[in-house]
């Protein structure tokens, strides 16, 4: 009997795990959290998985279109942001993805190797400014590279690297560092940003257009850089090859001491056209050289060349840090966090966001990029608003205003949302996938901007644009107030029509389309009421009708077990649903934005269902057994828990994001987290992730419930 009983328990457990997607190591913990003491909660707030690596650390000046990436292989690259292109324009997209990128790599020692990214350390200046240091240790040599970039003018940035090594052995050692400078097609050098990071010797690609002449670096006939020795011998190495035996011959005694053995994937056996720096170094002594590059090789002037020669690494580093301090003034939010490095994090997240706002020098506005790498050219207005609204709370009004100028430039500009609309006149478009919620999101940001800034000129300039956007939403929801032929009321009554809801969903998706259309409409009504606009009264009635129609549908989407479906099921053959978005684009925001009270019985049942059947550990955005859509869902739930006075649950939503929603050495946020693979860091850095964490940090200090 005992054996049969054990088998029965096993099979029941397996079926339960299959149905609910949990294992013993990943149980939902929220239901019991409020019953625990704070000491128990704090004890439980430990690391169970490895935080993500910093994969893409941006170090370029604020608002530059020449993004400069530092990766954990100590590689630095310049990748241009081509502005105002559409994700639906194949030719534009192909051109952007195959553009020529500047890439600078380093190989250490002799025979040479590239660093194993899992063994490097990255740091920010003062732990918050994107002036970076990367270091590595192998064969008793400590390698350290400092990276800084400063703007010279609207078209040019100077990148400056101080490269050094220290002999930490007890005997004289030859230090050798090779620098490979090349320009490569982006889609041939860099992987798509949903692919886990890797960097092996296959990335060490030949490039024959760069040459060193004395201390000047040329691309063809164009001066692009300079190398300066502090105490190393510098020379151009045209060609040199090594064999695996040469690497294996130095296997011992290195492995006895645990440092320096180079596995095959990091060996660079064929050297072609590199800058070589070499020096015999005494124990505990160091050797250095400086590498300077003009990152935009297509727009180099005599002024740029003169600056290249005159500016030292110290000059560039000091100016870079000074420029990163500029946004923080007496008119912006000041905080004083005493624990957990919150002060540094709060600064870093704001600077990362400002780096993602790309300056259009002609039109004087900022294109709000979502970040990442492969799709940095496109604007998702939904994500841009999540990135920018919290910046209003920090007082960064100018940057938000210039970004609003860009977002509203997409109104009636040829980038409309896609759906079965009566018209798109007045709608706000987007250059990324054409989500239907962009107009509501743009309204939310614009109206909150006025609420925070009281910018009267903005009100005068934007009133007509806001009204056009409001009338578009109202026109579309009025058009669906049609009964069925038998006189019954469809669930689509009074809601937004069939539309593209997200990157993977199309149909009647209340979760993505209606919730945020309502949110923007409500913000607009509050704005119009605050300025006593003539249409405010009638629009308030329309808003409440929309709320009523939404509540009718939501009650019918709610199931007996508490689950609320995110979409209205119809027989339309064009419906698309990304199954892995079911637990990411969720119905929780109906309470976050105020469509329904979180204390209502319907929503309490939803909370119970979600905590027991969807949440895993303290993650709220499960995609599968390993991967979680991080920060977004936790950001939805934190204010709900605060409204309910469930402080420990609110605490854990933020702590989960701080632990697993970003890298810890350089505070780089990302879209998803993989329990097993910290090198999986898609969309890093992540603009909306920055904003949501800033929002949650501020909510933890001060939360204002409109009721």
Where are these regions (language model features)?
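Terminal accessory carbohydrate-recognition/targeting modules of carbohydrate-active enzymes
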Residues: 25-337, 706-707
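Conserved oxyanion/phosphate-binding beta-strand-loop segments in alpha/beta enzyme cores
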Residues: 120-133, 331-373, 604-605
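Helix-terminus loop motifs that line ligand-binding clefts
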Residues: 124, 128, 364-371, 392-498, ...
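Active-site acid/base region of carbohydrate-active enzymes
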Residues: 223, 227, 232-242, 247, ...
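Extracellular glycan-targeting catalytic surfaces
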Residues: 268-269, 279-281, 291, 317, ...
